[in-house]
Amino acid sequence: MRHKKHIFWLAAVGLFVLVGVAAATQPHPQTADVSAAFTADQVRSHSRTCTQDGNTFRITNAVWRGTATSAEPRLGGTLVISTRTVLNETTGDGWFSGTWRSKAPASMKPGKGGRPHANARLSGVIDNGNHLDGLATGQAWAPWARLLGNLSAVVNGTNVTGELGANSPVAPDNSALLYRGGC
């Protein structure tokens, strides 16, 4: 009889622990619309060209440094964008891939995860030789969330200006979202 009581209590405690762990590992779903405007200057660049079927292609690896402005601290502050572009100089069309790294100013009080910051992978298309439209997918920290958003930018010489999740330069909607959790 005593042995059955011990097994019952052990099973009950084990069940409470299991339920507690399950509740702790799955945060409630959350979403937040976000946006950021940014400008950056090219600090490093390497290009090469090749010709194929009468078209000249320019392949460029570049690093851009600047600032991002956002009401969301994880997207604002110092910004480093690294890109690889392949541009058909004959037609002005091409594609790009790269990374976005933003970090809030040092004056921001670090939370549990440190200073608010975000990292994302970028990919998209180039139109008219200097207009970029693409997608940013990544994560933000302090607090943690996933990042998914549309990106639009214009390159003028060694400067890039654009927006992540804003209504311009392309209307009506160029959304970005921070999200986490599940049901």
Q: What role is predicted for each listed range?
A:
Residues 10-19:
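Bacterial N-terminal signal peptides
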Residues 2-10:
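Bacterial N-terminal signal peptides that target proteins for export
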Residues 25-183:
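Beta-strand-enriched cores of mature, soluble protein domains
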